[in-house]
């Protein structure tokens, strides 16, 4: 009986560890060309991800209602400060413009931030996003160099890649 209990706990633990370490995306892998993202900022200005070819880009999918996203903001701000040449391209998966605008103001997000205010329906699917925040580091050629970064490894991964570019 004790062996059965230990076996069941071991299986449950392995599923929990796998769920924690599993990537937050099922479509994009390192080496892929990043899919196009086109959306507008709060003033209605359209931004295309491809407009930033020639630059390193940190593409961050987030939402105002997401606690993990809010906890990630100081890390993204620190990266933006340390790497001023890095383009931060935020894509909000909010469903209301008011919530999105309020979050931009509240957290003083000064980088490019766009949304279609349709939640997960439009821009998230090409990236296979299943959880937010999910962040991608894209090189100047548009190639994904890091996938599904999250708060715990975001700074380390960005440092590792950009300091060795």
Placement of each model-derived feature along the sequence:
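Bacterial Sec-dependent N-terminal signal peptides
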Residues: 1-23, 165
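N-terminal "domain-start" segment that seeds a small globular fold
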Residues: 20-49, 163-164
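Short loop/turn microsegments at loop-to-beta-strand junctions
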Residues: 34-35, 57, 132-133
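Short, internal strand/loop/helix patches
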Residues: 40, 101-141
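Conserved redox-active cysteine motifs that mediate thiol-disulfide chemistry
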Residues: 53-54, 58-78
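Loop/turn elements at helix/coil->beta-strand transitions in domains of secreted/extracellular proteins
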Residues: 54-56, 84-86, 109-110, 140
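Structural microenvironment flanking redox-active thiols in thiol-disulfide oxidoreductases
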Residues: 71-107, 119-125
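Thiol-/selenol-based redox modules, centered on thioredoxin-like
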Residues: 139-165
């Amino acid at each position: 009986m004790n062996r059965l209990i230990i076996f069941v706990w071991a299986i449950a633990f392995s599923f929990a560890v796998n769920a924690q370490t599993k990537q937050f995306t099922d479509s994009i892998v390192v080496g892929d060309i990043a899919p196009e993202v086109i959306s507008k900022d709060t003033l209605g200005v359209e931004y295309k991800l491809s407009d930033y070819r020639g630059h390193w880009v940190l593409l961050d999918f987030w939402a105002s209602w997401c606690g993990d996203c809010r906890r990630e903001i100081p890390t993204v701000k620190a990266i933006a400060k340390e790497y001023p040449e890095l383009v931060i391209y935020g894509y909000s998966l909010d469903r209301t413009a008011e919530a999105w605008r309020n979050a931009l103001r509240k957290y003083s997000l000064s980088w490019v931030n766009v949304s279609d205010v349709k939640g997960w329906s439009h821009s998230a699917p090409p990236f296979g996003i299943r959880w937010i925040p999910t962040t991608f580091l894209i090189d100047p050629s548009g190639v994904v160099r890091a996938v599904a970064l999250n708060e715990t490894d975001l700074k380390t991964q960005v440092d590792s890649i950009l300091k060795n570019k």
